[in-house]
Amino acid sequence: MAKEFLIELGTEELPPTQLRTLAEAFAANFEAELKGAELAHEGVKWFAAPRRLALKVAALAESQSDKVVEKRGPAVSAAFDAEGNPTKAAQGWARGCGITVDQADRMVTDKGEWLLFKQEVKGQPTSEIVVELAAKALANLPIAKPMRWGNKTTQFIRPVKTLTMLMGSDLIEGEILGVASSRTIRGHRFMGEKEFTIDSAEQYPAILEERGKVMADYEARKAIILADAQKAAAAVGGIADLEDDLVEEVTSLVEWPVVLTAKFEEEFLKVPSEALVYTMKGDQKYFPVYDENKKLLPNFIFVSNIESKEPRYVIEGNEKVVRPRLADAEFFFNTDRKRPLIDRLPELEQAIFQQQLGTIKDKTDRITELAGYIAEQIGADVEKSKRAGLLAKCDLMTSMVFEFTDTQGVMGMHYARHDGEAEEVAVALNEQYMPRFAGDELPSNGVSTAVAMADKLDTIVGIFGIGQAPKGSDPFALRRASLGVLRIIVEYGYNLDLVDLVAKAKSLFGDRLTNDNVEQDVIEFMLGRFRAWYQDEGFSVDIIQAVLARRPTKPADFDQRVKAVSHFRELEAAESLAAANKRVGNILAKFDGELAEEIDLALLQEDAEKALAESVEVMTEALEPAFATGNYQEALSKLADLREPVDAFFDNVMVMADDEALKKNRLTLLNNLRNLFLQIADISLLQK
């Protein structure tokens, strides 16, 4: 027999940003426990609301299946001595099984005969083991800071108030986290029944929705919020900004979602929309509304946790809450504009970037110089890049950014425009932080690009330079900064070398850095970011490793190599040539002497080695234009033509000949062959 199983843990308010993660982990952990216990079932569904985590298991077996456990002992040849008496090994094994040697069965295999112990194990009832399984699943949740409550010694992410475990209509008795299982379930704080009893697992979650006014199905709540918010925005002629992270957080904050629309005074629209949106989304968890031209409208959408008979009062209440925050933004905006950004530059002396690396003013000076250098390399306006670098961090000293930290950069752009700075300079103040996350847009112009790269490189080199390379945590977001630099160079195709960029950035720190290997460490770190990035892009690890083996420090060049090797791998000749390169590498690794640069044609004896020597010579000359222009795909496509002469060489030529001169000449030929491929990648690392 199989029944539906329910477990619900009633808690105090769970952290909204962690609710989905907790619920999914609970389900995954519990399913793993069920499989480990060999309890048949047809799937686990999770439920999550602000004050509960729950699971329902479909068709959970009422008990484990009976099974026969076999334990193999020593081979019969080792189990008995010459007189046929059990050896100590056999006796020890039998004792461990709880039997005597003569009670053991025999197992015959192709490799011989063995002692065997068979034991019939009766399956345990689910009701007797499921409590422990659930407790283990909860104990392994990803909880960074568990807490204790009352006088209990148990710990969980929040205090636990109720526990319900039902197998069909049967109550599973037991205790988890200091709370005994019962049929009592708590409803909504302000609507429905505060507490009620549940008769069977099948009633969940419908009974909770009907009697408790709690929608336990997380995805259903989210779907309602999305659909109703879109309708509400359309009703005022707009489109709701339904950023998924915020939708997830709001879904995790409400038990009974009611979507409402409110408004604010149009005069606030004179303030840059980013500041208003920061207030609405960050502080109040509201959804802004835009028109079809992406212009902010004087409306916002919010999700109430109660179904009020007078929703207008709920709307008015939220409008009253947001109005002072918008007024603050307006005040800061008007006040900040009374002083030009450049006047705030000296104030950066009072803000520490990092104790050993100096103030933000020190960082600004380095960014200014480095941005000018990069601008020169990529053909951007040097003076504008330096000006943007000088102003880059000035908005950190404004009231707006001090109060609304996420507006840094974008407010600098607005203030720079107000001050009459060049448009490229103003835009760069915002775009210096791009790309902010994976998949984000890149800076839109050369000035922005120069400043963005300068800022990131300064941070990376500085932190590595004082020996604080990221290990587990990454407080300075160096991984993201590195990927940002690489993306900019690769996607814009800049012919920039990390060696030069890192060396220039290092030179600007004077004697502040203490790590003598900072340049090498930074480059190795950034090459490691290549591996992660290109794996995410779908390139296999062996292709990436084949290119990294050549340690190319020009990101755009690295990109071309990876794509070329990826194309080469699909060619018919690839597998054979990769194996040949591996073979050549192994042969050369065993040779301890020195090889000539050129082969001696007079020493060529076999037709196959003559053919390969001629092919390598012709190919070397033919590939010069491709190598010079970085056309690696064309080069590898041509190198694929070497498959036949290479295969013929290994089939017909003894490389390690007894004649030393002959052997060295053949090794030189193979070395020249391998070097052709190594100008692009080490294809011997390619897997089948």
UniProtKB/Swiss-Prot annotation:
It comes from the Bacteria. One of its GO terms (biological process) is arginyl-tRNA aminoacylation. Keywords: Aminoacyl-tRNA synthetase, ATP-binding, Cytoplasm, Ligase, Nucleotide-binding, Protein biosynthesis. InterPro entries: DALR_anticod-bd (IPR008909), Gly-tRNA-synth_bsu (IPR015944), Gly-tRNA-synth_heterodimer (IPR006194). This is Glycine--tRNA ligase beta subunit. The gene is glyS. Tetramer of two alpha and two beta subunits. Disulfide bonds: none annotated.
